[in-house]
């Protein structure tokens, strides 16, 4: 089995969510996290764009997305890109 790189966009619940705290929790909870970047959306709201390396075994990408969605302060997490490594 190989690995895939997932690029996910994470939308916080509101502009009041502490993104530095959310980044710290992502680093602690998401195995294979490689990169985190902030992207402005508008009206003071920013999203996070992250890169995660996971196994291409069935269900790994969905499990990663679900784990992120379960974090406090996260409104939505969606895989926007997927590539083989």
Language model: regions and residue ranges:
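Long, contiguous binding/interaction regions
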Residues: 1-85
């Amino acid at each position: 089995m190989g690995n895939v790189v997932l690029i996910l966009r994470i939308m916080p619940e509101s502009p009041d969510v502490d993104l530095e705290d959310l980044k710290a929790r992502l680093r602690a909870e998401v195995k294979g996290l490689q990169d985190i970047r902030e992207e402005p959306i508008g009206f003071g709201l920013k999203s996070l764009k992250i890169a995660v390396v996971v196994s291409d075994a069935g269900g790994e990408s969905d499990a990663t997305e679900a784990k992120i969605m379960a974090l406090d302060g996260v409104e939505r997490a969606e895989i926007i890109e997927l590539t083989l490594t």
